[in-house]
């Protein structure tokens, strides 16, 4: 059985290349995560006027939370900076900071909205480059190899995410099954239909 999928068949927005990359990472995790985990796509966390986007989120009981920023197309890191695209059209990006900021925003939001233990559970931020080969021995100060998911890692994506959470995740303890359910319920945030509201009031 696959993990819980929210939504079951996500519609990834953005450019064709960007959507294809996010879909590739989502499918890789869908196919490798255990059935007690949950896989969420395209989440937004609004803090005041600042919006954080989470491309893919793994909620894994007994392990923790994995916040993944996906960057499609060719990715390079040179002169201490990240670039997406091919010269002369490459543009500068900061995927590690994006993912890190989103992780902090998510854990703060969880702690403030009824899941304080989940907000303190182990959580890691990762970056995924599904169209870029990343050598096994590569690493950068802000991005050890364990938090970088390259094209060659997709076949074993869940194991890579698990190692990232266990080796590099902040927090105090693994995520319990109960807290995982709370996280999924809070993030899914179903809005009752008019019929359901009438039935509940009857």
Locate the predicted segments by residue.
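Intrinsically disordered, low-complexity Ser/Thr/Pro/Gly-rich regulatory segments
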Residues: 1-202
